[in-house]
Every structure is written in C-alpha cells, then in structure tokens.
Amino acid sequence: MRKIAIAGNWKMHKTQAEALEFLQTFLPLLQDTPEDRDVILCAPFTTLTALSKNLHGSRVQVGAQNIHWEDTGAFTGEISGPMLLETGVRYVVVGHSERRQFFGETDATVNQRLKAAQNHRLTPILCVGESKAQRDANETETVIFEQLEKGLVGVDQKNLIIAYEPIWAIGTGDTCASSEANRVIGLIRSRLTNHDVTIQYGGSVKPDNVDEIMAQPEIDGALVGGASLAGDGFARVVNYQ
C-alpha cells in the first residue's frame, strides 16, 4: 500500500534558533493532520540534532539533504551515514537537481549514495527530473528513465521514496500542471519493480496549489522547498484537503 509523505526541504536555510522558532508555529497546527501522512523536515546538517531532540515523540521525522557513500575518509565537506544516524535522522534527500547542477552529482554517485543510505537503515528520497531544454526537446521520459535505470541499480525499492521534480519548476514559481505531473509520475511508477513506492511531486508546491496536486491519483506526496520555510504555510501544505 502506498504511503503519503510530505517533506520540507529547507536547503541552506535556518540556523538552530530559527529552526526551533519554526517548530513553535508549526507543531500546534498539526493536531488534526490525518495519521496516514508522514511529515518530514529535511534540514541543514547543523540543525539536525536540535530538531531531532525537539521533535522526539512528535509525528514529524527529520531528514538530511546529502550522504556520502563512505563511512569515513578524506572527503572534506561530506557527511556519512553513521554521522547522520547519530543525529537521529530517518530520511535523506539524494540526487536533488541542485546537487546535480552545482556539485557534479551524477547518476553513478547518486546510486552510491542511495545504497549507503539504505545500508544505514535510512530511507532515501531520490530526486529525478528534466530541465526546460530537455522538456522542450520532448526528452522528459528519456532523461527520467535513464536517471532511474542508472540510479536504482542494486537499490531496495521497498525502502525508497522518489520525488519527481521538473527542474524548470524548482524555485521559479512555475508549477507543472497537476495532470502532467500525474502523467509523468505514472510513467515513473511503470518503470519500478515495486509499484507501491511513494512518489512525490516537487516544484513550486505552495498552499494555494497543493490541494489540486494531491488530488491526482498517482501523486503520493510533495517535496516542498520555499513553502516549507514558514511554519503556518508548510502546515497548510501538510494539511491539504
């Protein structure tokens, strides 16, 4: 059975103090949130321990935004699975388009990170999606299928979330039409061996469009960027109708 998962991706936002201030607004607004919705905050490394401590016993889980495939080593600036486990996280974003675009992430390194996450009992959120140029060239399916084929080698699809994030819709205010997002996510599902994998939509998800997005039958959740930074706004997304 497919699970619903709403995840906020804070990216490089929020100090520890700002993260805890967010919780004061956010948590009281979840009292009536349906129990079948997993709520996840994917936060900067420096806030993970504080968030985990303050969310203990709540319905909100904590996620990281990256993981290295080695447990230790000379990898300046990276973070490993054992380090993440120590902070109390349960999820980790892997292969976000910003990592692919700005930090040289490839399908091969994405695959290594996915397997590292699973080896440490973390649930990875694999991001896939096409650029504007690729969509205009009718290459959406080709690009995404290649990302899936190369990224999922040796990956356990029973411990996995996938987020479809059309790159042209991330942080731009442009949202993929909900019907088109539903179509692409259906295609993604058709390429999986486990058809019960939770597949999210990401890309300018906001309080004023989340209801329409989540009404689509193939969409199991959302990976939310800018709209996850304000407690009241993200609560509205989590509490979609």
From Swiss-Prot:
An annotated GO BP: gluconeogenesis
Transmembrane segments: none
EC number: 5.3.1.1
UniProt-annotated binding residues for substrate: N9, W10, K11, G171, S204, G225, G226
Family under the similarity heading: Belongs to the triosephosphate isomerase family.
Subunit structure: Homodimer.
Record's protein name: Triosephosphate isomerase
